[in-house]
Amino acid sequence: MFSDKMILIAGPCVIEEEETTLEIAAKIQEIVAPYADHIHWIFKSSYDKANRSSIHSYRGPGLKEGLRILSKVKQTFGVEILTDVHSPEEARAAAEVCDILQIPAFLCRQTDLLVAAAETQAVINIKKGQFLSPWDMQGPVDKVLSTGNSKIILTERGCSFGYNNLVSDMRAIAVLSKMGFPVVFDGTHSVQLPGGLKTHSGGQTEFIPTLTRAALAAGAHGLFIETHTNPAIAKSDAASMLSLKAFEVLLPVWNQLYQCVRSFEMASV
């Protein structure tokens, strides 16, 4: 589905203004361009963050306006688009614009949502819930496969570890890989401190380099990275997003590590 290139799902957490979204997409494209032979970039952003901690938090522009902006990103930069869907009713509309439909971690066991998304025949990225073991992901996978759609990505994003904390078990990469689909590691949501700031989630971005390197070394097929020109003023997940400046510094490291691990795996076959 993605050949041997490293999958890189990257973009801002939520769609903000159209100008901001296009600016971020342009910068990511510029950063990724030198690695086009080795990296498969997919732009991601959400039209609605339906699970914000507070009723007062910004959720996004909504389905109609959000898809319009994502369509403009797709047309302007010629990039594949990923967004998350939250109900069966949203899946068909989102699939008209987006190449990949994402099932949010909190909703990864919702049968009707999984089936509706899969029936569009889009690629389905299932994010593993913080409450699931890696082997429990076989259930969501089977629900997607029941529709005849086998275009699946599995994303590991950490497990709940007590209150307001997550931990990443790299054994999950190996377990999920045995299901036969590309496994992506979410390097930014994995450093969240869910609800840690009362009305919104905190984050420990200083651990993004460590965890992303570990995931690639463990055999992940790619990374999911939320990034922003200025995370401090981002309207969602400001505490856990990676700055574009840091993204640019880390990208060659990720690329080299991915190529090294893939070379080792090929030599071991």
Swiss-Prot record:
In which organism is this protein found? Chlamydia abortus (strain DSM 27085 / S26/3) (Chlamydophila abortus)
Q: Does the keyword Iron-sulfur apply?
A: no
Q: Which GO terms describe its biological process?
A: keto-3-deoxy-D-manno-octulosonic acid biosynthetic process
Q: What protein does this entry describe?
A: 2-dehydro-3-deoxyphosphooctonate aldolase
Any one cellular-component term (Gene Ontology):
cytoplasm
Q: What does the sequence similarity comment in the record state about its family?
A: Belongs to the KdsA family.
Q: Does the keyword Nucleus apply?
A: no
Q: Which reaction does it catalyse?
A: D-arabinose 5-phosphate + phosphoenolpyruvate + H2O = 3-deoxy-alpha-D-manno-2-octulosonate-8-phosphate + phosphate
GO molecular function of the protein, one example? 3-deoxy-8-phosphooctulonate synthase activity
Give the intrachain disulfide bonds. none
Which InterPro entries does the record cross-reference, listed alphabetically?
Answer: Aldolase_TIM (IPR013785), DAHP1/KDSA (IPR006218), KDO8P_synthase (IPR006269)
Listed pathway(s): Carbohydrate biosynthesis; 3-deoxy-D-manno-octulosonate biosynthesis; 3-deoxy-D-manno-octulosonate from D-ribulose 5-phosphate: step 2/3; Bacterial outer membrane biogenesis; lipopolysaccharide biosynthesis
* Intracellular or extracellular location(s): Cytoplasm
Give the EC number(s) under which this enzyme is classified: 2.5.1.55
State a single Pfam family of this protein.
Answer: DAHP_synth_1
Entry keyword set = Cytoplasm, Lipopolysaccharide biosynthesis, Transferase
